[in-house]
Amino acid sequence: MPSTIRLEVVTPEKVVFSEPVNILIAPAIDGEIGILPKHTPLVTGLKTGVMRVKKDGEEVKISISEGFMEVKPDEINVIVRTAELPHEIDVERARDALKRAEKRLNSRNDRIDRARARAAFERAIARLKAAGHY
């Protein structure tokens, strides 16, 4: 059995990650899912969170927003709205976004779009977790 599977993470703007990996753990809509080489083909929705990629004993965290994942026995294609590697994340900006989202979620103003505030909150948490600051 091969010890790696090709992972490609793409957004509308760019290819964020494209390398062979040993395992991918991703935030699927029904819970975390782990993908190893030679996995059964599948397509699943992804929710905002942190993907963990293990390669040669190292772990890389990638902050993602919602999207989809297509798995084939020899490759994984992840298509998401946004994705960031830890070194790309502006931690202060993510902290500020978290504070703003918390403030909106705690507001009693009926004009606040709670779904958007919740999405912003989840994105900020994912970014901080991927950067190792949450």
Swiss-Prot record:
Q: Which InterPro entries match?
A: ATP_F1_dsu/esu_C_sf, ATP_synth_F1_dsu/esu, ATP_synth_F1_dsu/esu_N, ATP_synth_F1_esu_C, ATPsynth_dsu/esu_N
Q: Does the keyword Cell inner membrane apply?
A: yes
Gene3D superfamilies assigned: ATP synthase delta/epsilon subunit, C-terminal domain, F0F1 ATP synthase delta/epsilon subunit, N-terminal
Q: How does it sit in the membrane?
A: Peripheral membrane protein
Q: Which GO terms describe its cellular component?
A: plasma membrane; proton-transporting ATP synthase complex
Report the superkingdom from the record: Bacteria
Which CDD domains does the UniProt record give?
Answer: F1-ATPase_delta
Q: Which UniProt keywords apply?
A: ATP synthesis, Cell inner membrane, Cell membrane, CF(1), Hydrogen ion transport, Ion transport, Membrane, Transport
RNA-binding as UniProt keyword: no
A single GO molecular-function term is: ATP binding
Localization in the cell: Cell inner membrane
Q: How does it assemble?
A: F-type ATPases have 2 components, CF(1) - the catalytic core - and CF(0) - the membrane proton channel. CF(1) has five subunits: alpha(3), beta(3), gamma(1), delta(1), epsilon(1). CF(0) has three main subunits: a, b and c.
Question: What is known about what this protein does?
Answer: Produces ATP from ADP in the presence of a proton gradient across the membrane.
> What family classification does the UniProt entry report for this protein?
Belongs to the ATPase epsilon chain family.
Protein's name in the database: ATP synthase epsilon chain
Give the species this sequence originates from: Halothermothrix orenii (strain H 168 / OCM 544 / DSM 9562)
Quote the gene name from the UniProt entry. Answer: atpC
